[in-house]
Amino acid sequence: MDWSHLWLYVSPPVLGGIIGYFTNDIAIKMLFRPYQAIYIAGRRVPFTPGLIPRNQERLALNISKTIMGSLLTPQELQNLARRLLQTERVQAAILWLLRLAIEQINTEKNEKSAKIVAGILRDLLGESLPRLLKVLARREDFLEAQINQIFDQILLEFQLSEEQATRLADWLLEVVLPPDMLRQAIVDFLTDRTIQIIDEGFREKTSGTYWVVANLFGLRNTLTRLRTFCLDEKEATNNRLQELTQDLQIRERIRKFLQNLSLQNLPMGTVRQLRKTTRESVRHYLQNSGSDFLQGLTDSVDWENIAVVLLNRLSTSSVVSTSLEVMSQELALILDKYLEKDLEIIVAQAIPILSIDQVIVDRVKSTSPADLEAAIEGIVKNELQAIVTLGGVLGFVIGLLQTVFLVLSQY
């Protein structure tokens, strides 16, 4: 062997290794380069642009079909939806939305929310509730337990205290029945006709000594003089009535009467009948006039201010904060039951809406050949480096075999 021709034996494995190592990069570049068609004398040069840029639309369709047929099948999408919509994740999302809504109300305090809540309250009390009451009030047992409870616990046990009875007695004697009012009542009562009836009745129905007095003297003159005195001597009459009120202890008698006034002192049968009458009266009132009452109440209430107060109270209420987790958990369970039953149908309906295949096609078509080339080269360098190395090894081995054959051919 002529060692002066050593390069003939060394070059095949070296060149084979180099070619094998860089073949992948060269092949990738040949697939993409050139990016644009090249024209000479108005005619397109063959193999321009590269294979992938020239068939990018068809490549996009094939990639979309491959992904949708092998990777993103309906079953895989259902599994993906199940993992995404796990109860814990759904609960966390709902809880986040509820807290976000509360925070939004806290930060904005806007009039729009107040108007919405005010409209709901106005419709509930002014429209929905009256219609509901009118229907429910037709039932014989409507509010029976509630009215009986109010009657037994409040009305039946209600009794004026000593101070309340004293003030009520003072009000009756000073405002309702003052001396001047009593004097005028006496004058109005003692008409000529009334005096005649009293006198005749006294004469006819008395006997013994009273008969003698009635027929000799009678009551006509006495009652007439009393009426005349009340008309002519108003101040004196008022003073006399005031003295009689004090001497007869009318104030104290009224106070004791009012203080002892209680439904518990009535017979049991009367109490039961009164309770039944109260219940029927309330039911008939709600049935006949409840709608008008609620409508008038609705018109007189400033619902926007109430809505603002309600929103402020809810935003700072600890009950609302603690109940958000319970609400989110219950809503998540309801959604989980619904998805468990209809997830397949939902996914089947969602696939055409999402148009995942068209998204893939549009994305591949809109990506420039240079970006596609860079992406594939990145995958080869990061994930397929072993193939590149293996290409270099195979090239080196093939070149080495050529050297062996060359050496053997010398002998």
From Swiss-Prot:
It is found in: Cell inner membrane. InterPro entries: DUF445, UCP032178. It is a multi-pass membrane protein. Keywords: Cell inner membrane, Cell membrane, Membrane, Transmembrane, Transmembrane helix. Its main location: membrane. One of its GO terms (cellular component) is plasma membrane. Pfam families: DUF445. The chain crosses the membrane at residues 3-23, 387-407. Belongs to the UPF0754 family. This is UPF0754 membrane protein Npun_R4433.
